[in-house]
Design a protein with these regions (language model features):
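AMP-forming adenylation/ATP pyrophosphatase catalytic core
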Residues: 1-181
Length: 181
């Protein structure tokens, strides 16, 4: 059964209980043999207000930093800082921001697309393994709109434009583990 499942083109995601506490999981191009069940999604919600500059998300081992820059500083830094950072027009962004885990039915108005798209469909289209999806936080504005999926997509809300006076930079990074040398 394992050989057949690994050689078949579809389905691209599956798991098989091998007995004795072992499982075999296929996630797109990866085959994993494990003695523990896949990690269940941890539910969390945090508020990120402007005076705060760093928020630690212990549930997923990451930290979110927030920096406000004037237009001139933003122009010097440039907008290309990778998928783990996002720039927003701070005057257009509805505060406070909320960082939370994914919920069933979540949608985002993706920059460059007309209309909205389900977060689950974006994860599937980008071939993000289901075991990694719970570690990706969603950043929502004060109206509840998802404005950024770190490492994945940014929404069209509060996009930086030529009339932007100040810019809010959000960055997601790995939490440094204490006690390691």
């Amino acid at each position: 059964a394992v050989r057949r499942g690994t050689l078949q083109e579809h389905p691209t995601v599956w798991s098989l209980d091998l007995g004795g506490g072992l499982i075999c999981v296929r996630q797109y191009d990866t085959i994993l043999f494990s003695s523990k069940p896949p990690q269940q999604q941890v539910s969390y919600t945090y508020r990120l207000s402007l005076p705060d500059s760093r928020l630690e998300l212990w549930e997923i081992g990451k930290a979110m930093t927030m920096t406000v820059l004037e237009r001139e500083s933003f122009a010097l830094q440039g907008e290309d800082s990778g998928k783990m950072s996002a720039w927003f027009d701070s005057d257009e962004l509805v505060l406070p921001l909320t960082i939370r885990s994914r919920l069933p039915g979540d949608t985002i108005r993706v920059m460059g697309l007309n209309g909205s798209k389900k977060v689950k469909d974006i994860f599937i289209d980008d071939k993000i393994p289901s075991s990694e999806r719970s570690a990706i936080p969603l950043v929502c504005d004060g109206s509840g709109n998802i404005v950024w999926i770190p490492g994945v997509r940014r929404s069209m809300h509060a996009a930086v434009g030529r009339h932007t006076a100040s810019v809010l930079l959000l960055t997601l990074e790995e939490l440094e583990k204490s006690g390691e040398t």
